[in-house]
């Protein structure tokens, strides 16, 4: 056994030794082949006809060839035989040596490679024969330094053999075919793979050139490289106006440049409204109380960048299999809208589903897709600007659109994506629902709405009820003359204020019905006309025992603003929802309007009843598509940018408008509020926040309409005590009598009416307050 192991070990040693010698021999041959190739290449480069050579006999003292006389003979021989092909002969020899000796670690012997070597040798000969023949036909004697011909003697013989049969064109075609076959056999190159690789690189190069030169196809790229006069003769570029162009179905094949819409220049009215536009003592705030915007407004994108961005959008959509062309671009203060004309048969929903992928590929925070643009057959793609512009309250309130608005309930929402001011009328909404997450700009937008109301209306035109559970946002307006009651911070007081609004709504409806008018504008016009005619109308709802009833006065608009009504829904419960729905259904004609905001856009806060009766919504940035659908009944708010970026859904419209809300500084709000406090003192209405005990809403409204028990008046056993209490406290209201003596609303109302008839208290004034006329007993 030991002998066997020894024999086996000796045999393995011999195999390893032979393999090692074979490897070294192959490496040595490879080095010799490379050296021969380098020698021949240098000899060919330094060839000169004055040197001695194989094709001629000459005696010289000095050989010009760098490789000496041997190199001169060798170079002369190869050039004489194959002509210009001699210059690639060294490279072919080096390549053949590298192919033959490269796999030095293979276990197979050289004889097993003979079929492959024979094919490579055949390819080598085909390259020399076909290449030299082509050189002999087309190059000939171009270079006088050659010993014979551009194709050598071999090329001349091959050309003379084929030329009489196939002529020049046929001979060249046959030789090119054999040359390509020879390259394939010698190098192993696959022409199909080469063409496929060439096509892929050509597409990549085309995309790169398209982005750089503003083209999207080879046709576009070729035309973009032509002189401008040639381009004008080749194609007429359509001018895309503000109206939608009539695009044919193959519009994607047309050469078109997207229209870059110019930013609008806002018309600023510099003069101040220091005098009221109506009768009264109060004056409107001055615009100088607000901070003017900086004048250095720089565009976020230049026109060239917008053109390049348009092409990039088209290319990114093409990467996802969507063919589209940008036909118009609308740059704005915060976002830029690209209007896309989709190819025929492409659904807009495909683009919508790619919003996140497009945002990633375009390297932006978010992308919003507008599937329907009214009046146009395109879709919108909104991208955030790299430099965001700050929209200030001054530049919106100072615009011609706001200053020329006739309504006293004009709201300034901000600017749209094109930079145009968005001015709306609260009276036409007639109520507004605002929702958005914390930090999205909701409270700042409420301040902007409040300022736009205060800059349009005096206390004679507008009265406010502000509900602020946070005790921070709206408390700065405490003490302004527009308030009906101090800023409400307790949610139970807020419910009482809404109940008072219901009673006031019913009272106004009864007044309008008695005059035969349909809304508060008709009522005020009729009352004003009667006053100017010298025959004022009397209040039909109040009868006086002595003298005549009080005269009717114009009724102000009433706006209830709640910064967070979700707390009301939690604390008070379903009763608040019933009150809100009742006001939303009927209060428009009575001149009572609601603006409710919440940071919890959930179905338990924004209920179906509230949504059905408040069709106008403003959605700021939310965290999910579900929250967006809760507010707008559609997605989109989750793609907003925050900081005042909002979607405004107008009544009767299913397409929200993107608006950038104005930024209002705390200092500006303080200055305006202080100005209003100095101009006039507040005139609060007593009893608005008085609670009504356990009386439910139906009984409350029935009492407000005059129903219930007939007991009351001077015959009431509590009348004397009530008169004494009123004279002592110097305050009177139905709610205070009801709360003090624990009686029903209708009974307390009759006691107050009896006091008015007896001259103890004055008739109800325009703001609902009464004055105690009876002297104090002290």
From Swiss-Prot:
Keywords: ATP-binding, Cell cycle, Cell division, Cell inner membrane, Cell membrane, Chromosome partition, DNA-binding, Membrane, Nucleotide-binding, Transmembrane, Transmembrane helix. InterPro entries: AAA+_ATPase (IPR003593), FtsK/SpoIIIE/SftA (IPR050206), FtsK_4TM (IPR025199), FtsK_alpha (IPR041027), FtsK_dom (IPR002543), Ftsk_gamma (IPR018541), P-loop_NTPase (IPR027417), WH-like_DNA-bd_sf (IPR036388). It is a multi-pass membrane protein. PROSITE patterns: FTSK. Signal peptide: none annotated. Gene3D superfamilies: 3.30.980.40, P-loop containing nucleotide triphosphate hydrolases, Winged helix-like DNA-binding domain superfamily/Winged helix DNA-binding domain. GO terms for molecular function: ATP binding; ATP hydrolysis activity; DNA binding; DNA translocase activity. It holds the Pfam family FtsK_4TM. The chain crosses the membrane at residues 28-48, 81-101, 122-142, 146-166, 172-192. ATP binds at residues 439-444. Residues 193-778 are cytoplasmic. Residues 419-629 form the FtsK domain. Consists of an N-terminal domain, which is sufficient for the localization to the septal ring and is required for cell division, followed by a linker domain, and a C-terminal domain, which forms the translocation motor involved in chromosome segregation. The C-terminal domain can be further subdivided into alpha, beta and gamma subdomains. The alpha and beta subdomains multimerise to produce a hexameric ring, contain the nucleotide binding motif and form the DNA pump. Essential cell division protein that coordinates cell division and chromosome segregation. The N-terminus is involved in assembly of the cell-division machinery. The C-terminus functions as a DNA motor that moves dsDNA in an ATP-dependent manner towards the dif recombination site, which is located within the replication terminus region. Translocation stops specifically at Xer-dif sites, where FtsK interacts with the Xer recombinase, allowing activation of chromosome unlinking by recombination. FtsK orienting polar sequences (KOPS) guide the direction of DNA translocation. Belongs to the FtsK/SpoIIIE/SftA family. Homohexamer. Forms a ring that surrounds DNA. This is DNA translocase FtsK.
């Amino acid at each position: 056994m030991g002998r066997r192991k020894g024999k086996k070990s000796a045999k393995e040693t011999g195999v390893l030794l032979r393999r090692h010698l074979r490897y070294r021999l192959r490496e040595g041959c490879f080095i010799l082949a490379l050296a021969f190739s380098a020698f021949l290449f240098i000899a060919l480069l330094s060839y000169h006809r004055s040197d001695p050579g194989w094709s001629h006999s000459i005696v010289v003292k000095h050989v010009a060839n760098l490789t000496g006389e041997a190199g001169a003979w060798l170079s002369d021989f190869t050039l004489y035989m194959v002509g210009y092909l001699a210059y690639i002969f060294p490279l072919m020899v080096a390549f053949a040596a590298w192919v033959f000796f490269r796999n030095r670690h293979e276990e197979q012997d050289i004889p097993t490679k003979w079929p492959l070597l024979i094919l490579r040798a055949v390819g080598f000969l085909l390259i020399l024969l076909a290449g030299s023949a082509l050189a002999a036909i087309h190059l000939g004697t171009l270079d006088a330094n050659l010993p014979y011909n551009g194709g050598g003697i071999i090329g001349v013989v091959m050309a003379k053999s084929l030329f009489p049969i196939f002529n020049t064109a046929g001979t060249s075609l046959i030789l090119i075919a054999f040359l390509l076959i020879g390259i394939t056999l010698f190098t192993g190159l696959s022409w199909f793979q080469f063409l496929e690789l060439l096509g892929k690189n050509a597409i990549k190069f085309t995309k790169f050139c398209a982005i750089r030169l503003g083209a999207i196809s080879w046709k576009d790229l070729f035309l973009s490289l032509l002189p401008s006069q040639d381009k004008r003769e080749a194609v007429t570029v359509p001018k895309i106006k503000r109206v939608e162009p009539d695009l044919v179905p193959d519009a994607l094949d047309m050469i078109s440049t997207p229209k870059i819409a110019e930013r609008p220049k806002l018309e600023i009215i510099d003069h101040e409204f220091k005098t009221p536009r109506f009768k009264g003592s109060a004056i409107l705030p001055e615009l100088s109380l607000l901070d003017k915007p900086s004048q250095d407004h720089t565009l976020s994108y230049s026109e060239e960048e917008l053109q390049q961005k348009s092409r990039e959008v088209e290319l990114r959509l093409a990467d996802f299999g969507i063919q589209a062309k940008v036909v118009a671009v609308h740059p704005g203060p915060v976002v830029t809208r690209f209007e896309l004309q989709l190819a025929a048969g492409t659904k807009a929903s495909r683009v919508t589903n790619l919003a996140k992928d497009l945002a990633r590929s375009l390297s932006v925070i978010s992308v919003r897709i507008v599937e329907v643009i009214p009046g146009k057959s395109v879709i919108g793609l909104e991208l955030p600007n790299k430099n965001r512009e700050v929209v200030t309250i001054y530049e919106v309130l100072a615009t011609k659109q706001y200053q020329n608005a006739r309504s006293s309930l004009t709201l300034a929402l901000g600017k749209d994506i094109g930079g145009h001011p968005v001015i709306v009328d609260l009276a036409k909404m007639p109520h507004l629902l605002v929702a958005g997450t914390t930090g999205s700009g909701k409270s700042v937008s409420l301040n902007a709405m409040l300022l736009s109301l205060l800059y349009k209306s005096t206390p004679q035109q507008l009265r406010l009820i502000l509900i602020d559970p946070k005790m921070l946002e709206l408390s700065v307006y405490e003490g302004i003359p527009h308030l009906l009651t101090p800023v409400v911070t307790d949610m139970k007081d807020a419910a009482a204020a809404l109940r008072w609004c219901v009673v006031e709504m019913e009272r106004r409806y009864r007044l309008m019905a008695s005059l035969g008018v349909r809304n508060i504008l008709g009522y005020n016009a009729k009352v004003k006309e009667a006053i100017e005619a010298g025959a004022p109308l009397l209040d039909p709802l109040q009868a006086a025992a002595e003298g005549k009833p009080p005269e009717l006065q114009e009724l102000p608009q009433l706006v209830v603003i709640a910064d967070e009504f979700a707390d009301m829904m939690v604390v008070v419960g379903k009763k608040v929802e019933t009150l809100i729905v009742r006001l939303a259904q009927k209060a428009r004609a009575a001149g009572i309007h609601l603006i409710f905001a919440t940071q919890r856009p959930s179905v338990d806060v924004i209920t179906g009843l509230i949504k059905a009766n408040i069709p106008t919504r403003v959605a700021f940035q939310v965290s999910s598509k579900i929250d967006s659908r809760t507010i707008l009944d559609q997605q989109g708010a989750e793609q907003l940018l925050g900081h005042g970026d909002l979607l405004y859904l107008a009544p009767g419209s299913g397409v929200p408008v993107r608006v950038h809300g104005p930024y209002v500084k705390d200092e500006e709000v303080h200055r305006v509020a202080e100005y209003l406090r100095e101009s006039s003192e507040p005139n609060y209405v007593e009893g608005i926040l008085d609670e009504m005990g356990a009386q439910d809403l139906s009984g409350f409204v029935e009492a407000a309409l005059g129903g219930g028990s007939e007991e009351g008046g001077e015959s009431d056993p509590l009348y004397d005590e009530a008169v004494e209490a009123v004279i002592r406290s110097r305050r009177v209201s139905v709610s205070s009598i009801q709360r003090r003596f624990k009686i029903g609303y209708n009974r307390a109302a009759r006691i107050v009416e009896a006091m008015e008839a007896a001259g103890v208290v004055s008739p109800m004034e325009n703001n609902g307050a009464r004055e105690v006329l009876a002297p104090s007993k002290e």
